[in-house]
Each structure stands twice: as structure tokens, then as C-alpha cells.
A protein has these predicted regions:
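Non-catalytic, mostly N-terminal accessory regions of nucleic-acid modification and defense proteins
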Residues: 1-203, 265, 269-278, 372-375, ...
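Short, surface-exposed amphipathic charged segments that create phosphate/polyanion-binding patches used
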Residues: 285, 383-390, 427-433
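Conserved Class I SAM-dependent methyltransferase catalytic core
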Residues: 20, 24, 33-46, 199, ...
Length: 529
């Protein structure tokens, strides 16, 4: 009797599923349309999962906790939208619920999903203009192709993939993948995870308001929320405000935040922060940002020359927005205790065109720390960039459980350019958790310890304002951090003697090998007698 064979099913990884989704659409639509379609499906899948989880939670509360077993009463409570909305969960009908949508026949799937998007856009204020309208009919995928993609997305089961942040892994996979394959401008919306984590860890946005004037897909807000959760804080104590000028990325931000249940205020439309500040009269406790590097053509609005945000500092160059971002961020900070962490190209550290503005920032004591990051951390550029920390309160006092000292007139410089050993995707650099902790340790110790001299060669140095003044108001860390001259450690006489010995040894080996080779040819009859 033949032996019965056991069929072995290979367990699919999350990355395999997500790759299959991308692969199914290869060559079938424009890149941005593929991104929007896939992220919309992920969005519908996960709001459906949160809806089911909330439904189970409500039933458990009524039946198990309150002891009410009247099924009619239970069903009535389950059908009340406010039972879901109070926990940041969207109330879904059969028309918008993933588990119902995926039962649609393949030929009607595109219309069903587009209808679900329009229904959510009409009925959920937070999702107004967040989802791409008619994206499924626009891409015109064959019914079988769309069905295969939907089936792949449906495999992403929270019960199977128990990651702490499964939503984040899925969203970041697509954002990262499309950023890697995009050109520079299309890749601007994605800030590497380890950089965002570093910013959040340094400025500690535990409570109050968090603002990003160029929020991209909302990554800064997501990381801030995760930071709060990791430290046992209350995410509902934080209010998120942002703005984004690119319409497609504006939609991504709304989807990214809504899918996680993060309450947000992103303004009424996608528009430039410079020409139309959507939060004009507000000041914020924390600001996290990754503005487009060296942005040009940002100043084409009527009030540029007289913009009140430049008051006391001078008008920034119209040809490069770096210092316009700095002044905007400073203008939006709470005047008593606001703190900001943001990224700029290294050229902003010593740009001659902005010397007077930089001089005023230093003399007004707004710059707390300058941290140069390693190269190759971004998908869209290989340049090294700088993390700036601005602080409106360097006078000291209690802060998140620590007693800070008075740091008036001081700026901490940190140089991380050599921290480039953690490579992924063959060439990109990512800071490790240990490295992020080390930077925080340097920064926090400097904030709290008595300051006499705070320095470590080739890594950090705390400079007084008068030192910065003496160096022409340059903020380049290498102007302050001590770098050891390795040449002075070399004993040249001994080194030359050793090299001479090595050369003599090589010459002896060469002569011996040559003699053996000549002898071998003689034996073969080719040598001279």
C-alpha cells in the first residue's frame, strides 16, 4: 500500500504577503495610483478589524461585566455609533465593512470599494478628502487581479501577526517601498523611523500639543504616540496639529492617523504652510518636522517680505526655505516652554546668506542642540543632515521628572557622522536603539549636570555663546568638537624602519622565487646552460 504523503504548507511571512500585493500590480498602474490603492485597501481592512474588536469589547462590557444578557438590548448598544466613536473607532455599515466588501463578486469589486470610500468621505468628518475617490475604477484593474490583491490583504490577520504595531509595519512597508522606488520629490514624505524615534526621544512630547508644519504621511505624530505609550503616558493627553501641501500626501496622513485612532487637526486643505498657515493663531508645546531640504520657490506669495514670522530676524532668502522653516517653527513655539526638533540640510549650519538670522538666533539663545547625523539615512538623498533642537526655556526647572539646570548661553554640539555601521537594504544607515539611547544620555546629562566642561573628543562638545561668536556664528559641530590628529600619534622613524625591514624581506622572497622559477625552466629544457 502506498504511503500517504503529508502536504506541507509553507507559512507566509508578512513581508511575502505585502510583496505579493506589489507584484500583482507590477506594470498595471502608475506608481502613485498603486500606492493609493494598496494603502486604501489596508485602511479598509484595519478599520474593519478595529470595528470588530470594539464590537467584541462592547459586548463583553455589557454581558460579562454588567451581567445583562438581553440580546435585543445588546444589539441595540452595538448599533449605536457613539459606542465606537468615543474610542476613536469608525462605525461601519455593511457598505463600508471589510468582511462584507470582500464577499463582492470580482466583477463588482471596484465599484463596491469606490462606493465604500465615498460613503466614508460623506459620513466621517475626519475622513473628508482623506481617501482617493474613484481609485479602483481609475486604475481599471482586471477583476481577477483586484480580487487577488484583496485576497492577499485579507491574509494580514492580527491574530496571526501579533506585532505590537502591525498597522505600522504594513503602512511603513508600502511608504518605504514606494519611497525607495520614487524620485526625490516623491520620496520626501517618508522620514526614516530611527530619526523620528530620536527626535521624539529627545524632546519628549508627553502631553500638550504636537505640531508638524510639513507633516508628510504623519510619521512624526505616529512615533510621538508610540513614544508616549512606551513610557506609560496617556495618548489622549496629546493634541496633534499638522499641515501638508501635497494633496496625495495630505490624504495619506489622514489615513495613517485615522487607522490608528489618533485624533488630528490637519487643516481644511492641502496647502503651503508659508502662503496659508492653517493654524495661524496657535502656539505649540512641541514641534517635530522634516522640511523638504533646500526648498526653492516657496516665497511666491504676496506678504513674503512683510511676513510677521520674520520679525526681529530679517527676511530669509527667497531662493532657499531652510531659514524660513526655522523662523516659522520658532514663531509657532509656545513662548514659555516650547521645544522643537527638526531636520535641515547641513548647509544651513554655516550659510553666509543667512549669517544675520543665525547670529540673532544664537544671541537670542534659541538653539539648544545641533546634532549631525550619518550619511545615507534617507532614501531620497545620500547627504548628511542635521537635527536642530530649539528651546524657548533654557533657564532650568522641573521637566518630565528631571530637574534641569540653567543652560542659558550654551549650545550642545554632537557629531554622529561615524555612526554608520548599522546597514540595511545594502546601503542605508539606521540608528540602533543603543545609539539612540546614547544620544539621549549625552543630551539629558548635559541638561542636568553642573556644567564646567562637557565634552568627549570626536563626539560632543557644549559651547558657550561667546565661543560661537568667536567662530563667526558657525554652527558646524567640527568647529567645536575636538578631533584627534592621528598623525601625531605615529612614530615616523620607527614606522620607516619597519617598512624598510618589510621591503627587504619581500625582496628576499622575490629573489628566492625567481631562482626557483629559473631552475624549473632549466629542468624543462628551456633555461640557458
Amino acid at each position: 500500500m502506498a504511503k500517504k504523503q503529508t502536504k506541507i504548507t509553507k507559512e507566509e511571512t508578512l513581508e511575502t504577503i505585502l510583496f505579493n500585493c506589489r507584484n500583482s500590480l507590477r506594470g498595471r498602474a502608475a506608481m502613485t495610483d498603486k500606492r493609493d490603492l494598496l494603502l486604501t485597501l489596508v485602511f479598509l481592512k484595519f478599520i474593519g478589524e478595529r470595528f470588530k474588536q470594539q464590537k467584541d469589547k462592547i459586548r463583553h462590557e455589557i454581558v460579562e461585566v454588567q451581567g445583562i444578557h438581553d440580546e435585543a438590548f445588546v444589539e441595540m448598544q452595538l448599533s449605536r455609533p457613539n459606542q465606537y466613536m468615543q474610542d476613536g473607532v469608525f462605525f461601519l455599515t455593511d457598505e463600508t465593512f471589510w468582511d462584507k466588501l470582500i464577499l463582492t463578486a470580482p466583477t463588482g469589486m471596484a465599484i463596491a470599494f469606490d462606493t465604500a470610500i465615498k460613503t466614508l468621505d460623506d459620513n466621517e468628518p475626519k475622513l473628508k478628502n482623506a481617501l482617493p475617490q474613484q481609485i479602483f475604477t481609475k486604475t481599471a484593474l482586471e477583476p481577477g487581479v483586484l480580487k487577488s490583491v484583496v485576497d492577499e490583504i485579507n491574509k494580514i490577520d492580527p491574530k496571526k501577526f501579533t506585532d505590537h504595531d502591525l498597522i505600522g509595519r504594513v503602512y511603513e512597508y508600502f511608504l518605504q517601498a514606494f519611497s525607495i522606488n520614487a524620485d526625490k520629490e516623491e520620496g520626501e514624505f517618508y522620514t526614516p523611523h530611527s530619526i523620528v524615534e530620536l527626535i521624539a526621544s529627545l524632546i519628549e512630547p508627553f502631553d500638550g500639543t504636537v505640531y508638524d508644519p510639513c507633516c508628510g504621511s504623519g510619521g512624526m505624530f505616529v512615533q510621538a504616540t508610540k513614544f508616549i505609550e512606551a513610557h506609560g503616558g496617556n495618548t489622549k493627553a496629546v493634541n496633534v496639529y499638522g499641515q501638508e501641501s501635497e494633496p496625495a500626501t495630505y490624504r495619506l496622513a489622514k489615513m495613517n492617523l485615522a487607522i490608528r485612532g489618533i485624533s488630528y487637526h490637519l487643516g481644511d486643505k492641502a496647502v503651503s504652510t508659508f502662503s496659508d498657515d492653517q493654524h495661524k493663531d496657535l502656539k505649540f508645546d512641541y514641534i517635530m518636522a522634516n522640511p523638504p531640504f533646500n526648498l526653492k520657490k516657496y516665497a511666491e506669495y504676496g506678504e513674503f517680505e512683510t511676513d510677521p514670522r520674520w520679525k526681529g530676524y530679517g527676511v530669509p532668502p527667497a531662493s532657499n526655505a531652510n531659514y524660513a522653516w526655522i523662523l516659522h517653527i520658532l514663531n509657532k513655539l509656545d513662548v514659555n516652554h516650547g521645544i522643537a526638533g527638526f531636520l535641515l540640510a547641513n548647509g544651513a549650519l554655516d550659510d553666509s546668506d543667512t549669517l544675520e538670522i543665525r547670529k540673532q538666533l544664537i544671541e537670542n539663545d534659541k538653539i539648544e542642540a545641533i546634532i549631525v547625523l550619518p550619511r545615507n539615512m534617507f532614501y531620497s538623498t545620500d547627504i548628511s543632515v542635521t537635527l536642530w533642537i530649539l528651546n524657548n526655556n533654557k533657564k532650568g526647572g522641573p521637566w518630565h521628572g528631571r530637574q534641569l539646570r540653567n543652560r542659558t548661553g550654551e549650545t550642545l554640539f554632537i557629531d554622529l557622522r561615524t555612526w554608520n555601521s548599522n546597514i540595511y537594504e545594502k546601503k542605508y544607515v539606521r540608528l540602533t536603539e543603543t545609539e539612540i539611547s546614547r544620544v539621549c544620555q549625552i543630551y539629558f546629562n548635559w541638561q542636568t549636570e553642573n556644567f564646567a566642561e562637557y565634552a568627549e573628543p570626536e563626539l560632543y562638545y557644549a559651547a558657550h555663546c561667546d565661543e560661537i561668536q568667536q567662530k563667526g556664528y558657525s554652527l558646524v559641530p567640527s568647529r567645536y568638537i575636538e578631533f584627534i590628529d592621528r598623525d601625531t600619534e605615529i612614530d615616523y622613524k620607527s614606522a620607516l624602519t619597519e617598512m624598510s625591514h618589510q621591503f627587504d624581506e619581500l625582496k628576499k622572497r622575490w629573489d628566492a622565487n625567481e631562482a626557483e622559477l629559473v631552475n624549473a625552466f632549466k629542468i624543462l629544457g628551456y633555461g640557458k646552460e
